Swiss-Prot record:
<protein>
    <recommendedName>
        <fullName>Uncharacterized 6.5 kDa protein</fullName>
    </recommendedName>
</protein>
Length: 56
């Protein structure tokens, strides 16, 4: 996870704290929106680049 956050900072120029917060928010929103699909590996539904760094 740390490596993915660092990659995100390099690629998108966001701070560690902001990236972490956005990943958490996107994971929560993705989890909520995909809850009824039965696929628990899908956690991110936002189009923001931070979503690419989110995984189970």
């Amino acid at each position: 996870m740390e490596k993915l956050w660092r990659r995100g900072i390099e690629e998108y120029g966001v701070t560690y704290a902001n990236l972490k917060l956005n990943v958490i928010i996107n994971c929560y929103e993705g989890e909520r929106s995909h809850r009824d699909t039965g696929n628990h590996n899908i956690h991110c539904s936002s189009a923001k680049p931070y979503s690419l760094l989110c995984f189970t």
